Amino acid sequence: MTYLASQKESVEKLRKKFLKTLGDNYIVGSNTEVSSFYGKSFMFDIVIFKNNEVVAGILVKNFCLSVRLICKPDQYINVFKDAGLRCGILYLGKDDEFYLWTDGNWSYQNVDFDGIVNSLKDNRPVGEPILIDDLAVEILSLLPDKLDDVECHHKIELLFKEGNVNMDKLNGYISFNSVAEDIFFKALLPQKRISKACRYTSLQSLFLLLKDKKHCMCSLTCMNDKGETSYADNYVGNGAYAENYQILEENNNCYILSCCADSKQDDLTMWRLYGCDAKGVCLRYKVNEKLVDNKSFFFAPVSYGSSEKEHLELEFINNILNWTKNGWRFKLNRWHIWKHFFKSYLFKDENEIRLLYVHNNDIEIEKCWIMDSKNSIASRLCLFDIDKDIFPLKVYSAIIGPNCNQQASNVAQFNYMNMQQKVIPFNRWNEAIVASKIRDYR
């Protein structure tokens, strides 16, 4: 048997052993790439996940490495650190030849398989339940100084009352109920009440909207920022992020519509950036707040970092997830939803308002696959019939871009088409779709 075949067999055997021992709460993948917060990627023979978070990365090496480890004990520690792992493991072929590294240390512990499992499960006894008032003090103390404004502090403080907080003594987790957790996340987002919004898109999108009488949302996988789906996970996951099937499933069942404030309608910069170089269309929406139910539809402005390495709201969330007292830890059960409302400061000029749809089996929605022409990624779409009153955004006007070919003809034709299809409300046939007022852009 070749060395590579033997190595592959050792990895798969160890992977299955961890999978069997750790149980259903863990996912154990092989040959998985882990991305650090700073954009570096590292390949590990085995990666262990819990709650979609990277718990540990494992490198499987031959037995001869143990001699080198004695001579150079920090071997591979920099790899674990640079990958942003909380736990790194070297396996040398025998059950008693595991070298365990944990974040904050500059050396390994030599442990057996059971010791590794106990360390990963972090089985700690849970003390007496924490009084809610004391819990409020603990959590609020984790607010970064720059973020500790009076309004945010007050909104979060009000959440700590009977009925809002659950304590799972069996697993040692404290959590909010879903309504309270939604309020918690909204308190960390920009505080704006939005009754109108607009979206820059292609002329083809307007055509399909009128032709098919359907609103279209794309899955998260087709976002223009390739780190879109992992940015927040990276930040609060201590820098280590890797995709597994469950994360892919979440991303393909979560759909997005990127909007901006209505004050940005017919804005030259927005036309250039998002309106197909001013050849596209700006759709204007009215928001039906009653349909933003925080069950299937979520609608809110996006929070942006203050610098490349600082995002205070995510820092607060990270502090909460790393908090512990008497064995108790805090769990955010709706993180998989609200994490998509946090983005890198590199995109702060967008001032994005985001509509998120999380697929709900109770609602019958048409879905299809496309090959995204811009990013060449296979992506899912979901389509909402305009005639069914379930979509929170209602188009009330459209503006054809200043650089659109045959602008006047397109305005007339789309208005006539809309009069036949009755998609955008109108008083006069030629008022629903108008030309941009910008006249000096080429």
Question: What residues fall within each predicted segment?
Answer:
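Active-site beta-strand-loop-beta-strand hairpin of nuclease catalytic cores
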Residues: 40, 44-57
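Nucleic-acid nuclease catalytic cores
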Residues: 65-106
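Partner-binding and oligomerization surfaces adjacent to conserved cores of proteins
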Residues: 131-442
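Short beta-strand or tight-loop elements
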Residues: 30, 42-44, 351
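Acidic-basic catalytic patches of nuclease active cores, encompassing PD-(D/E)XK
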Residues: 1-37, 49-50
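Short beta-strand-loop-alpha-helix junction that forms the active-site gateway
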Residues: 51-53, 59-70
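Short, basic/polar, glycine-containing "phosphate-handling" surface segments that engage DNA
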Residues: 95-152
